[in-house]
């Protein structure tokens, strides 16, 4: 099941009722209102726009809307609760059922959190095994390791970000989010020694290509039965012999198991010690 840390949905303006106009930025063209925009950056990103000119409702939010259930990320099971949580804020009332049926997904961050003890070591190994540095550009953006497909055409662009999720949560910008949780420590413990792989798909065509779908309905996107993160890694990493971390890996977990073995010099006792050291109590 696909899991997302961000989703953007476009639907009909008929599916929103603005309750508190004072919480929206009202945009005019001459004397006519053309849109209402609600933007929230903390404790989680939320953007709601009622575009009168285009008769569209635009909703964008991140997985932190799930609060204590954030580890589950946005998925097919909890997407309705995510939208209902927007209604609980009190600035607008969304017709959740119609949005889920008739909305179109136009942007997503496909996400996978994987247990691994050393994010820095893992990203070094991934970078060392990139097959073509002209085609795939590794770089550091906002303190995170990224690999981007170096193409001009937007529909073919793809960016994968790899970072230590526990460290990211402890940054100052997440202080308000953590303060509103029922059990902050439980969430931090969950993300201890977790490496996050996050693929940014910022256009309809990118989503179609990465998820192997033609229909961009909410259900179609969240029901996609593929792992685009692994497929991207499979494209960018070199073919290697049996001792290389990328050799004959069937899925992302196998890749990380191989990386752990390589870090521990293929010594099973060292592997077991690392797992005990970084396992949650």
Summary of predicted features, one role per range:
Residues 281:
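Helix-turn-helix DNA-binding segment
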């Amino acid at each position: 099941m696909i899991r997302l840390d961000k989703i953007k949905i476009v639907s009909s303006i008929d599916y929103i009722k603005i309750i508190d106009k004072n919480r929206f930025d009202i945009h005019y063209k001459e004397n006519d209102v053309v849109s209402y925009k609600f933007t929230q950056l903390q404790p989680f990103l939320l953007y709601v726009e009622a575009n009168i000119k285009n008769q569209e409702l635009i909703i964008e939010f991140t997985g932190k809307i799930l609060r204590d259930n954030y580890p589950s990320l946005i998925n097919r099971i909890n997407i309705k609760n995510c939208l209902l949580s927007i209604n609980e804020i009190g600035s607008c009332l969304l017709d959740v059922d119609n949005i889920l049926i008739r909305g179109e997904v136009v942007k997503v961050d496909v996400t996978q959190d994987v247990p691994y003890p050393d994010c820095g070591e893992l990203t070094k190994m991934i970078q060392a095994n990139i097959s073509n540095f002209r085609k795939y550009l590794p770089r550091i953006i906002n303190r995170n390791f990224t690999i981007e497909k170096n193409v001009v055409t937007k529909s073919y662009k793809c960016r994968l970000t790899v970072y230590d999720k526990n460290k990211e949560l402890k940054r100052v910008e997440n202080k308000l989010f953590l303060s509103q949780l029922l059990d902050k420590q439980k969430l931090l413990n969950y993300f201890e020694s977790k490496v996050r792989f996050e693929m940014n798909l910022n256009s309809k065509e990118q989503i179609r290509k990465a998820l192997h779908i033609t229909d961009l309905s909410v259900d179609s996107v969240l029901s996609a039965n593929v792992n685009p993160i692994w497929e991207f890694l499979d494209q960018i990493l070199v073919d290697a012999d049996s001792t290389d971390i990328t050799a004959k890996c069937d899925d992302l977990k196998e890749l990380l198991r191989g990386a752990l073995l390589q870090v521990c010099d293929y010594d099973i006792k060292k592997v077991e010690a690392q797992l005990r050291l970084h396992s949650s109590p």
